[in-house]
Amino acid sequence: RFLQAVIISCDAVMRYAKRYAVLAKEMAAKESNAARKAELLTIARNCERVPAKGATSFHEACQSFWFVQQLLQLESSGHSISPGRFYQYMYPYYKKDLDNGTLTREFAQELMDCIWVKLNDLNKCRDAASAEGFAGYSLFQNLIVGGQNEDGRDVTNDLSFMCITASEHVFLP
Protein backbone atom coordinates (compact mmCIF):
# COMPACT_ATOMS: atom_id res chain seq x y z
CA ARG A 1 0.00 0.00 0.00
CA PHE A 2 2.85 2.36 0.72
CA LEU A 3 4.26 2.01 -2.79
CA GLN A 4 0.80 2.53 -4.27
CA ALA A 5 0.53 5.74 -2.24
CA VAL A 6 3.93 6.88 -3.53
CA ILE A 7 2.87 6.23 -7.13
CA ILE A 8 -0.42 8.10 -6.61
CA SER A 9 1.45 11.06 -5.09
CA CYS A 10 4.06 11.17 -7.86
CA ASP A 11 1.37 10.97 -10.53
CA ALA A 12 -0.47 13.84 -8.84
CA VAL A 13 2.68 15.99 -8.86
CA MET A 14 3.17 15.33 -12.57
CA ARG A 15 -0.47 16.20 -13.33
CA TYR A 16 -0.10 19.38 -11.28
CA ALA A 17 2.92 20.47 -13.35
CA LYS A 18 1.14 19.61 -16.61
CA ARG A 19 -1.76 21.88 -15.63
CA TYR A 20 0.70 24.76 -15.31
CA ALA A 21 2.14 23.89 -18.74
CA VAL A 22 -1.33 23.97 -20.30
CA LEU A 23 -2.13 27.30 -18.67
CA ALA A 24 1.17 28.85 -19.81
CA LYS A 25 0.47 27.72 -23.40
CA GLU A 26 -3.05 29.16 -23.26
CA MET A 27 -1.69 32.45 -21.95
CA ALA A 28 1.01 32.48 -24.66
CA ALA A 29 -1.59 31.95 -27.38
CA LYS A 30 -3.41 35.10 -26.25
CA GLU A 31 -0.29 37.20 -25.64
CA SER A 32 0.54 39.99 -28.08
CA ASN A 33 3.87 41.02 -26.53
CA ALA A 34 6.55 38.88 -28.20
CA ALA A 35 8.91 38.86 -25.21
CA ARG A 36 6.18 37.82 -22.79
CA LYS A 37 4.92 35.20 -25.25
CA ALA A 38 8.42 33.67 -25.46
CA GLU A 39 8.67 33.73 -21.67
CA LEU A 40 5.33 31.91 -21.32
CA LEU A 41 6.37 29.28 -23.86
CA THR A 42 9.60 28.70 -21.91
CA ILE A 43 7.55 28.32 -18.74
CA ALA A 44 5.32 25.80 -20.53
CA ARG A 45 8.35 23.77 -21.70
CA ASN A 46 9.82 23.84 -18.20
CA CYS A 47 6.53 22.69 -16.67
CA GLU A 48 6.25 19.86 -19.20
CA ARG A 49 9.69 18.63 -18.17
CA VAL A 50 9.91 19.07 -14.40
CA PRO A 51 9.68 17.58 -11.95
CA ALA A 52 8.76 14.36 -13.83
CA LYS A 53 11.86 14.17 -16.02
CA GLY A 54 14.33 16.02 -13.83
CA ALA A 55 15.84 19.43 -14.37
CA THR A 56 18.60 19.95 -16.92
CA SER A 57 19.01 23.72 -16.44
CA PHE A 58 18.93 26.30 -13.68
CA HIS A 59 15.61 27.65 -14.95
CA GLU A 60 14.08 24.15 -14.87
CA ALA A 61 15.61 23.51 -11.44
CA CYS A 62 13.99 26.70 -10.12
CA GLN A 63 10.62 25.60 -11.49
CA SER A 64 11.03 22.10 -10.06
CA PHE A 65 12.04 23.55 -6.69
CA TRP A 66 8.94 25.70 -6.67
CA PHE A 67 6.57 22.84 -7.51
CA VAL A 68 8.05 20.67 -4.78
CA GLN A 69 7.99 23.54 -2.26
CA GLN A 70 4.32 24.27 -3.04
CA LEU A 71 3.27 20.66 -2.73
CA LEU A 72 5.24 20.07 0.47
CA GLN A 73 3.57 23.12 1.98
CA LEU A 74 0.18 21.82 0.89
CA GLU A 75 0.81 18.35 2.29
CA SER A 76 2.09 19.57 5.67
CA SER A 77 0.01 22.75 5.99
CA GLY A 78 3.20 24.74 6.17
CA HIS A 79 4.75 23.04 9.19
CA SER A 80 8.52 22.60 9.33
CA ILE A 81 9.18 22.90 5.61
CA SER A 82 11.94 25.18 4.37
CA PRO A 83 14.38 25.39 1.47
CA GLY A 84 17.35 24.57 3.72
CA ARG A 85 20.67 24.62 1.83
CA PHE A 86 19.12 25.93 -1.38
CA TYR A 87 22.43 27.44 -2.50
CA GLN A 88 24.07 24.00 -2.40
CA TYR A 89 21.57 21.85 -4.27
CA MET A 90 20.85 24.52 -6.90
CA TYR A 91 24.50 25.39 -7.55
CA PRO A 92 25.35 22.58 -10.02
CA TYR A 93 22.56 23.76 -12.35
CA TYR A 94 23.62 27.39 -12.01
CA LYS A 95 27.32 26.65 -12.57
CA LYS A 96 26.71 24.40 -15.60
CA ASP A 97 24.47 26.97 -17.32
CA LEU A 98 26.79 29.85 -16.48
CA ASP A 99 29.80 27.93 -17.82
CA ASN A 100 28.09 26.90 -21.06
CA GLY A 101 26.72 30.40 -21.69
CA THR A 102 23.01 29.55 -21.50
CA LEU A 103 22.49 31.60 -18.33
CA THR A 104 23.56 35.06 -17.25
CA ARG A 105 24.08 35.99 -13.64
CA GLU A 106 21.45 38.71 -14.09
CA PHE A 107 18.77 36.29 -15.27
CA ALA A 108 19.66 33.83 -12.51
CA GLN A 109 19.20 36.65 -10.00
CA GLU A 110 15.84 37.52 -11.55
CA LEU A 111 14.70 33.90 -11.17
CA MET A 112 15.84 33.87 -7.56
CA ASP A 113 14.07 37.16 -6.88
CA CYS A 114 10.89 35.60 -8.27
CA ILE A 115 11.30 32.58 -5.98
CA TRP A 116 11.72 34.93 -3.01
CA VAL A 117 8.46 36.69 -3.85
CA LYS A 118 6.69 33.33 -4.20
CA LEU A 119 8.13 32.07 -0.89
CA ASN A 120 6.50 35.06 0.74
CA ASP A 121 3.13 34.07 -0.78
CA LEU A 122 3.02 30.83 1.15
CA ASN A 123 0.43 30.76 3.87
CA LYS A 124 -1.77 28.18 5.46
CA CYS A 125 -5.44 27.55 5.96
CA ARG A 126 -6.32 28.40 9.53
CA ASP A 127 -9.35 28.13 11.75
CA ALA A 128 -11.33 31.34 12.30
CA ALA A 129 -9.66 32.26 15.62
CA SER A 130 -6.13 31.70 14.31
CA ALA A 131 -6.90 33.57 11.09
CA GLU A 132 -7.78 36.67 13.10
CA GLY A 133 -4.39 36.64 14.79
CA PHE A 134 -2.22 35.52 11.89
CA ALA A 135 -4.05 36.76 8.79
CA GLY A 136 -1.65 38.25 6.29
CA TYR A 137 1.52 36.90 7.88
CA SER A 138 3.58 34.68 5.65
CA LEU A 139 4.96 31.40 6.94
CA PHE A 140 8.56 32.60 6.71
CA GLN A 141 11.21 30.37 5.22
CA ASN A 142 14.45 29.27 6.82
CA LEU A 143 17.25 29.18 4.34
CA ILE A 144 20.97 28.72 4.90
CA VAL A 145 23.26 30.87 2.76
CA GLY A 146 26.74 29.71 3.64
CA GLY A 147 28.64 27.27 5.74
CA GLN A 148 30.83 24.25 5.69
CA ASN A 149 30.56 20.74 4.39
CA GLU A 150 31.11 17.62 6.49
CA ASP A 151 34.90 18.05 6.10
CA GLY A 152 34.82 21.62 7.41
CA ARG A 153 35.47 23.15 3.98
CA ASP A 154 33.74 26.44 3.17
CA VAL A 155 31.00 25.75 0.62
CA THR A 156 29.78 29.32 0.21
CA ASN A 157 29.20 30.05 -3.49
CA ASP A 158 27.70 32.67 -5.82
CA LEU A 159 24.18 31.53 -4.99
CA SER A 160 24.84 32.17 -1.28
CA PHE A 161 25.27 35.85 -2.04
CA MET A 162 22.48 35.86 -4.62
CA CYS A 163 20.09 34.59 -1.94
CA ILE A 164 21.00 37.59 0.22
CA THR A 165 20.63 39.89 -2.80
CA ALA A 166 17.17 38.43 -3.50
CA SER A 167 16.14 39.35 0.04
CA GLU A 168 17.43 42.87 -0.52
CA HIS A 169 15.68 43.17 -3.90
CA VAL A 170 12.22 42.02 -2.88
CA PHE A 171 12.28 43.59 0.59
CA LEU A 172 9.65 41.26 2.01
CA PRO A 173 9.61 39.76 5.53
Annotate each PLM feature.
Residues 1-37:
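N-terminal leader/propeptide and maturation segments of large enzyme subunits in energy/redox metabolism
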Residues 1-6, 35-42, 46-173:
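Conserved catalytic cores of very large enzyme subunits
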